[in-house]
Swiss-Prot record:
Chief localization: membrane
EC number assigned by the record: 2.5.1.141
InterPro entries, per database record: Protohaem_IX_farnesylTrfase, UbiA_prenyltransferase, UbiA_sf
The protein's name: Protoheme IX farnesyltransferase 2
Catalytic reaction equation(s): heme b + (2E,6E)-farnesyl diphosphate + H2O = Fe(II)-heme o + diphosphate
Pfam families: UbiA (PF01040)
Other comments on record: Carbon 2 of the heme B porphyrin ring is defined according to the Fischer nomenclature.
Name of the coding gene: ctaB2
Biological pathway: Porphyrin-containing compound metabolism; heme O biosynthesis; heme O from protoheme: step 1/1
Keyword Zinc-finger attached: no
Membrane topology (UniProt): Multi-pass membrane protein
This protein's GO CC annotations: plasma membrane
Location of this chain's protein in the cell: Cell membrane
Key words, A-Z: Cell membrane, Heme biosynthesis, Membrane, Transferase, Transmembrane, Transmembrane helix
Amino acid sequence: MQREKAQSRVAVYYELSKPKIWYLLVFTAFGAAVAASGIYGIEISIATWALMLFSVAAGSASANVLTNYHDRDIDAIMKRTQKRPLPSGRVTPAGARNFGLFLAGASMVMAACIALTTTPVQGAWAAAFIAFGLFNNVLVYSYMLKRRSRSNIVLGGLCGGMPPMIGWVAVTTADLWTMGLVMGGLVFIWTPMHIWALTLHFRDDYNKVNVPMLTAVHSEGTSARVIAVSTVAMALFSLAPLLITLEDGAAAVGPVYLATAAASGALIIALSAWVVYKPTEKAAWVLFKFSSPYLAVLFIALMVDAGLRA
């Protein structure tokens, strides 16, 4: 009985961390590390892998938990979120807050410890990226912007770009502010499209609690056009790696990434065009469900290209 209760408690806190979100972010960190390793021929130690992946997982989970803690009042009202651990009473507010703070501290420590398996500079950058991501997501987005500004997810979405940069800097600081930054930019620019498609689908829920998500407060037609513009921007930015020349003079990516970015970009633009043509919750939901695999495919292509280089 005690064992079953313990397992149930672990499962509830795991659910509270919103794993579907941090799985994708951890994957982008993994993809950036694999790409950097392949490009520069740098072997990544098991310890570095563990510190990098677990720090990103803990940091992302922490942001989700602390955001849920702050939003527990509106989550109890919105149909989409009423069954989450906090509004359903399966986790206490104090328990959620303490769990989130523990994860935040653990993520910072693990990121800083990358200095022990690589260089002090790499560890310092990894810890700085974790700290910025937490600050931007929890304080800037959740506490300052989410309930006040229609552009909340734009300014509050910078945190999404941190996992790929952590993955890159755990391998090398070379081209961190070119290729590493562009990888982070892929997630940052992808975020509004992804979230706006979700909020269009659940616009009534967001309006019920007076959260001014851009695609919830505007008409469906205007919202659909905003989503389409952000989708086109994402598809165009996904071609940015093709413009980058690395420090050794070589191109950052090759034909595999070009073909993947072009094909997947055309598909997601077509889906956004469907949302414009038929601005319904169903169309927005289809775009939302496709957006995560789309981002994952881009990072897979980056890894494959880097592997072919090696």
